[in-house]
């Protein structure tokens, strides 16, 4: 049908009311909180307990986030808190005795651990409030029951503690071990309060599980038979090496000119600067690859905001972790309790000072007896009798000998 000329064609559109329009909503929900294995895709991260108690004291963490520590003490119980952290105290103020305690200043000053603490005691029960000046910190309380010892990895993490048999000893890295520089070993029975940057969380490792953590985020961990070991992730960055005589051929190492140069003061000063530059680069440029590996069973307290790596690891520890091959960790040390092995004294004795018998014994593999034992076996066992003569002298007479 042809449209009529001069007549305008009308077009219409159907408008749907708002109530009948189709709308899609996006719902965002929190993931279900399960407790999967730590070696799986998820990590069982739990919050630290807000209160712990013993027979003589109770620690309660209050605030959101945790910013205050409430300490309830029984009569004649001592509380040690870091100097300048006491906020308030309730109870009979006339009975409270507060003294400034200097705890092992020489040992703690060497490792950078605070040694000025305030000792609070009272013959009547009191309640004290403890806090820190930093606004981005939170508290965690731990009940040390004597069955498991703790290692506080951060220098300023230990805030307060109470307990008559609680022993806190600063540790020093003397043999390039993985123990943190400036850590404190906590043994005995009592309550301790730890402070960290940001939020504090607890990681529970079961037997056979492993966890890799950055040393600046580790606040404390339980001391097990397997101490934490160095771990370094693989990377394609260029390794910084310090040139030395060992990289030269053996013929050049024995040359007189090379020996004279290596003994000069200028060469030694240059090598010292090279080593400092390598240590600085490992702690700043490649510092994000330095980690610690923990083996279960173990409990680890981690903080969400870690300090600088320089505040946690010493230069020797950074070099030790950096020297570990990428992605490789040494096997955990085995327990040697009950296994006593005697070291052969001939191993440390110079060859020119050994006798003919000692040289013969040292050349025999698998021989466990010493030279004195072999000579005694050859000579046999003799029995002698001491007789007192009339003139007052002692005469020793051999009675029998058995080979």
UniProtKB/Swiss-Prot annotation:
This is Altered inheritance of mitochondria protein 24, mitochondrial. It is found in: Mitochondrion. PANTHER family: ALTERED INHERITANCE OF MITOCHONDRIA PROTEIN 24, MITOCHONDRIAL (PTHR36959:SF2). Keywords: Mitochondrion, Transit peptide. GO terms for cellular component: mitochondrial inner membrane. Residues 320-364 are annotated as: Disordered. The gene is aim24. Pfam families: AIM24 (PF01987). GO terms for biological process: inner mitochondrial membrane organization. InterPro entries: AIM24, AIM24_sf, Trp_RNA-bd_attenuator-like_dom. Residues 1-30 form a transit peptide. Transmembrane segments: none annotated. Gene3D superfamilies: Mitochondrial biogenesis AIM24 (3.60.160.10). Belongs to the AIM24 family. The keyword Transit peptide applies.
